[in-house]
């Protein structure tokens, strides 16, 4: 099972945080970009503030535009083979993340359900949430912890999110710290955004941040609008989780129960989808859904509003766009809207040191090679992750790709139709020259997107919750103020807010 801060998703490792100053240096090789730096965060902050005005980072020079070479045949197929969940076992014990990913990547076909295992089948809706969290792996961060130490804790534990508590002796939580907050903080230090909170304390923290002084993670976690921190007791079921997460909420806390608000785990969209996959053979009622193409579920419709970033645009532009739109990843496309790759908010870790400042002015296309190289160095993976699906990809295979790539969303592409090859004088097709080519030649033209919210929303509607709205949480975040970051909410309050939202539409 993946580490989900006790259910918070696993993230790649990276050196300690140091907000970089923009540099005029040309992009280095991916290996050089990942070299360690001795520059401290305090020393770097002051440099980051200087010369970082937005006007300096609007568009890259043509010499910076370098699309990484496409992977060879076989490298791009790591997730194409992902089709079948792990085999049925009577035990509900948790499997390791590495074993699960390997199983997902190597399963060649989606096998039929075996009625000899009927005694092990169960309704997915009835599984309790305490089966899905690991209290012994839960890691907190105190609100007064300096942000750089909180970032180190994210890295050390391979998490993408940490619950924030007011004091070590407290186990109740009202909000979290994640890579989206880190991105907002980097942009704040560099002067691209301002804090919504204008209280004297907040303004003092902004001043400290821009002068290179430590600021508490509690302040950084409040820089952007978030979902109210929903708390659900441990004896609640997976049906409740799908209702919450299928409405667009990214994660919620699992607590001891009505008599105690002590948090025992954080359940995210990614962990929930992984759990569905790992136990898929036990949920026989999901077999028809797993086999259904995305287009039949309404998940692959052409969407002209998919958020993208041009391959020739700066990395800093991608970070700003993800922050402004409150999304966790962007599709990188060429001038013809062909999919080149994917940039995630977690990739902000690769520009968190002063030695990496040149990457802020690198093109997004070049940055894709840096991301790929980091994946290879950290995980030993020499393959290009497949972040795309087609309208005919099945629901089950889409889930499998999300599990294999740890992606929050997959891009829907219209595959390229190969043109007929001219024949040689002998009547045989001409041999194909194998050389570097753009990723678009393999990925196809971008037409839409499928997110974890979409996957869980379909699951909820499949279970009979026809009113489940995948856009509820996004609307709620847009209406929220910075004070909502620290608000707690019970499941009952969540249901009431949904009813109010329906009445306003």
Swiss-Prot record:
Residues 493-505 have a biased composition (Basic and acidic residues). One of its GO terms (cellular component) is nucleus. Keywords: CBS domain, Cytoplasm, Nucleus, Repeat. InterPro entries: AMPK_gamma/SDS23_families, CBS_dom, CBS_dom_sf, Ssd23. Residues 132-195, 225-282, 302-360, 382-468 form the CBS domain. Residues 1-70, 85-104, 414-441, 464-505 are annotated as: Disordered. It holds the Pfam family CBS. The keyword Transferase does not apply. PROSITE patterns: CBS. GO terms for biological process: cellular response to glucose starvation; regulation of mitotic metaphase/anaphase transition. Belongs to the SDS23 family. This is Protein SDS23. The lineage of its organism: Eukaryota, Fungi, Dikarya, Ascomycota, Saccharomycotina.
